[in-house]
Swiss-Prot record:
Compartment list: Cell outer membrane
Any one annotated GO CC term: Bam protein complex
Organism, scientific name: Buchnera aphidicola subsp. Acyrthosiphon pisum (strain APS) (Acyrthosiphon pisum symbiotic bacterium)
PANTHER family assigned: OUTER MEMBRANE PROTEIN ASSEMBLY FACTOR BAMA, SORTING AND ASSEMBLY MACHINERY SAMM50 PROTEIN FAMILY MEMBER
Protein name: Outer membrane protein assembly factor BamA
Family the UniProt entry places it in: Belongs to the BamA family.
Domain POTRA, chain residue ranges per copy: 24-91, 92-172, 175-263, 266-344, 347-421
Signal peptide residues on this chain, from the entry's feature table: 1-20
Amino acid sequence: MLIKNFFIAFLMFFSILVHAENKFIVKDIQFKGLKNFSQNEALKNIPFRIGSTISQYDVKNSIKSLFKTGKFEDIKVSFLGKTIVFNIRERPIISNVIVSGNHIIASSVLDPYLKKLNIETGKSFNNFFTNVLTKTIKDFYLDIGRCKPDIKILKIFSKNNSVSIKILINEGTEIKINSIKILGVQAFSKEKILSLFKLQDYHSWWNLLSKSTYSPKELNNDLEHLKNFYLSNGYYYFNVNTKKVDFLQDKKQVDITIGVSEGKKYKISNFFVNGNLFPYQKLITNLININPNEFYNRDKIDIIVNKITRFLSEYGYVNTKVIVDPQIDHKKKTIALNFNIDMKKRYFVKRIYFTGNEITQDRVLRRKIKQMEGKYFNTKLVELGKKLLEKTKYFSDVKIIQKLNSYDSNQIDITYQVKEQTTGSINFGLGYGVDSGTSFNLAFSQDNIFGSGNSLKVDIIKNDYQKYLDISTSYPYFFYNNADLNARFFYNDFKYNFDNISNIIKNTYGFEGNLGFLINNYNKVNFGFGYTHNSINNEEKKIHGKFTGELNINKLYYFVGVDDTRFKKIAIPGDQIFIKVTILKSNKNILIFKNIAVVNNDIICKSKIVFAKKYLF
């Protein structure tokens, strides 16, 4: 036992010595073979520096890190004492890229793809990506039915370790469809079946929307469309048995022959909903709108499955699996459908994040989100938040990213990824008129000022006849989420010159305010208050005896209004017509108006009732 313990201790001591000997302190780092890249740039891509204590493991990692840059073709490491020497062979630098022969693929489409593959001027050349490019372009031409396309990439290397790339594209020739035959069709006419195809033979001049050019991809799409047609009309066992494409002698035309078996039509005898679905069993059953003895319809069943998964996703079950298991009675030609539903875990939202909002404050976005943190995940509310963010017009794009916290967790983090866009404008004008003199105008508008979600508009006009200022601002969330405030301040001086009256100045200034409270998603109550001062002044104090001095009129008013933001659509004859009806019962007491718009055979109605009171003094 003593000998055994001594032997184990010896091995441990020996392994420590070996480990210590494998590590050393770096005295110097050298790079040989660098031409297009500096040594400092190379040093940034290795995990150690001069004076670091490293092992062989660190050296291997440094080689991997240098290769990841994509700038080096070969790397070998040697040691001179405690100096590490990297012997490097650089990849050539692409001096220019020339593409010719591409007529079907536009350069505006091809250039971004070349950039994605790093095939552009100034990048390191990698032969692997040119092979990927060749295969991708060739496959594209074959998919659209081009015969014998050819892609050649010429590489011209120079002495300064650069390469010029020329991409020569031969798009091949177009293949026409000589004939399409479908064998085995009995339930429908040949014309009906062929009308389902986008591909048509070139003799079918009557079908203007068809394509007479052969495309393998388009043919597969047509066959899938044909299968869906049969499966949606009760033919449960329909199948495409054969697909044959024969090239004619000139290789410019093909004959297409399709063999199908229709089978018999099947009806649905009954359906059953299976699974631990409490308390949603009845609600889910109501979503399945299948009547006994109606023909089997795969499209309808797919829609029902989507409705079920969508419904449960609004209650936190985001990974629901619905499997439709048919029980077939071949004798009666009936099918009983079993909707086997596994709701799985119920998820709730842990955190909601926002990214991309460099200007807009988080709180501006968060108040638009209806899904709450700590509540069960609701697809409807999450998507509604996206729509409301888009409705602000602050963002050109809004994306939703869902991330599970962990595999075993039932928590989801939601990220709204936004892309901000310009929400304001400034217009400036300067001119000169014989009567008005030098004229200056400024218009400023900003809908999301300082990222606060508030808006500000300023209009200024100044010339010899007029001094005009109008400032309006809007606070969509003034007190809390259901209250908004709109305010306006205005000032206007306008000078009139008539034949027998001169230097008459009309002066107007005042303010307006409106406070709105949202009652529900559709109705809002508005309370408004305003003041306007109007005066007419004669600078010369004399207007041929008609008027001397000053006339003042002040108006103070308030109003209460009810808005209905719902739009009612009723289809009627008519197109692109707009009708507006305004009814004034009293100019000083009650104002009632109603707008009706007719657009594309629909009536869009927005109604508003306002009770107003005015005081003049």
